[in-house]
């Protein structure tokens, strides 16, 4: 069974549990125990009652699964509304339609995560890099949020990647190193490899744009060790921005020709906005 086997419609945890139970062919009686009754499982699946943490662990154990296996099958966009909307927001940012993003803002945000999220919407809606009208207070808020993280989650990594333009280059680099060196990296890569790798590629791009070349090379070396043959998109982006970094430093004609070829490839792949940014960076060199 894999993630494609699980319906991607909006799920409550109970409905998701029911899908997994039925696909594995387990009945309530198969899962029930002295500490977990069939009626409790039924009410949980119907959304009538929530499980305690202990009951949820027993219910997962009853499926002969570990918690990691159970949640690994869960469609990633079901983990949180912020995770889901961040993906939608990325789409708007890519097609350069910032006016469509206003409706994504949370009205009267009170939670810390909601305030951070609104800052990300504001950043993504900017028409140009560095033209987002982010206040010093908002920059401080993002920095304090990221600094307070003790264990990185995939949502935190998405927030970090989305907020690079808010951070000083040195801050962004150090947060990236913290992710790459964290104790949970192997678990994060096991469940969310694509998100982690894309965030690090984004960091490398950001450091090259900011002419922080030695640090960009450090991140590239880390990525070279992480990326495998299936990460073609990430490998291409890493190559393009490595070429850009070399050209910005050496003004080599051969590197310029390679970059021009890369720009044509990006345009052919409908990444014209990124191609334009690279072209503009070359002109400013």
Task: Describe the role of every protein-language-model region.
Residues 105-106, 143-147, 180-187, 220-228, ...:
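Amphipathic alpha-helical segments of tetratricopeptide repeats
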Residues 24-42:
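Short alpha-helical DNA-recognition segment
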Residues 54-69:
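DNA major-groove recognition helix of helix-turn-helix/homeodomain DNA-binding modules
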Residues 72-99, 264:
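Short, charged recognition helix plus adjacent turn
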Residues 109-209:
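Mid-protein regulatory/catalytic core that forms ligand/cofactor-binding pockets
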Residues 16, 83, 87, 117-128, ...:
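"A position-specific structural signal for the A-helix of alpha-solenoid helical repeats
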Residues 91-104, 130-140, 169-181, 210-221, ...:
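Helix-turn-helix repeat elements of alpha-solenoid scaffolds
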Residues 1-23:
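A short, Lys/Arg-rich alpha-helix, primarily the initiator
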